Curated annotation (Swiss-Prot):
SMART domains: LIM
Species this chain originates from: Homo sapiens (Human)
Database matches in CDD domains: LIM1_FHL (cd09343), LIM2_FHL5 (cd09428), LIM3_FHL (cd09346), LIM4_FHL (cd09347)
Protein name listed in UniProt: Four and a half LIM domains protein 5
Origin: domain of life: Eukaryota
Record carries keyword Repeat: yes
Functional summary from the UniProt entry: May be involved in the regulation of spermatogenesis. Stimulates CREM transcriptional activity in a phosphorylation-independent manner.
Subcellular location: Nucleus
Length: 284
């Protein structure tokens, strides 16, 4: 472009010896440039002309003098700021109005600083510590009690219950037997290792047994039927000297009449009603 043809791209007025603005390599007189290309200030709604500094944030524009905190009116030029509901706020006003308060120290958690959230509350990272060892918990596993939050090692040391069988921590649930706690999965028959959680069981020397194992190993046997006599279901039995019978098995060895609540005679561990036993060489 020669000086003889140096003119405004919009109004074609000569720019020789005049102030002008280049846009996309094309010259414009100041008046046309301001009218055609100037952005409008978000605050005062006036054009930001070529002789003014245009401050831009998320496709919004301000005069340098209009770029202020909407709450305290302090300038935000070359200062950190935050936006809320399209309002610009200095960090102090934003913190007072919008930031979370630390659950521990009750102070504001400043924008941009790391915060920890747990059960709807917020902490400074340095305030979110184990109640016992006072070490930061961060994102590590934790267990919460009314007295505070605890890292897992401290909780296990201070509060946890241990399984009587495997000696490991019981974190939830569990079964109490003989004043001892057990994991549900550890509460097994001491004989066959059957799961006893949903089963009837009996004990021997503080060890749990399923009914079958207990009867097989420890229950007295009926003299008549040789089957175990178990009191688990409330079954009645008869005991005489060192022998025991199911009540339904306590019958005369000759006529089979029930002898429960009746007098009887014995001969070589057999029992007889008085009628059948009369004339026999009985023990009693």
């Amino acid at each position: 472009m020669t000086t003889a043809h140096f003119y405004c791209q919009y109004c074609t007025a000569s720019l020789l010896g005049k102030k002008y603005v280049l846009k996309d390599d094309s010259p414009y007189c100041v008046t046309c440039y301001d009218r055609v290309f100037s952005n409008y200030c978000e605050e005062c709604k006036k054009p930001i002309e070529s002789d003014s500094k245009d401050l831009c944030y998320k496709d919004r524009h301000w005069h340098e003098g209009c770029f202020k905190c909407t709450k305290c009116n302090h300038s935000l030029v070359e200062k950190p700021f935050a936006a809320k509901d399209e309002r610009l706020l200095c960090t102090e006003c934003y913190s007072n109005e919008c930031s979370s308060k630390c659950f521990h120290c009750k102070r504001t958690i400043m924008p941009g600083s790391r915060k920890m959230e747990f059960k709807g509350n917020y902490w400074h990272e340095t305030c979110f510590v184990c109640e016992n060892c006072r070490q930061p918990i961060g994102t590590k596993p934790l267990i919460s009690k009314e007295s505070g939050n605890y890292c897992v090692p401290c909780f296990e040391k201070e509060f946890a219950h241990y399984c009587n069988f495997c000696k490991k921590v019981i974190t939830s649930g569990g079964i109490t037997f003989c004043d001892q706690l057990w994991h549900k999965e550890c509460f097994l028959c001491s004989g066959c290792r059957k799961d006893l959680c949903e089963e009837q069981f009996m004990s021997r020397d503080d060890y749990p047994f399923c009914v079958d194992c207990y009867n097989h190993l420890y229950a007295n046997k009926c003299v008549a039927c040789s089957k175990p006599i178990s009191g688990l279901t409330g079954a009645k039995f008869i005991c005489f000297q060192d022998s025991q019978w199911h009540s339904e098995c306590f019958n005369c060895g000759k006529c089979s009449v029930s002898l429960v609540g009746k007098g009887f005679l014995t001969q070589n561990k057999e029992i007889f009603c008085q009628k059948c036993g009369s004339g026999m060489d009985t023990d009693i």
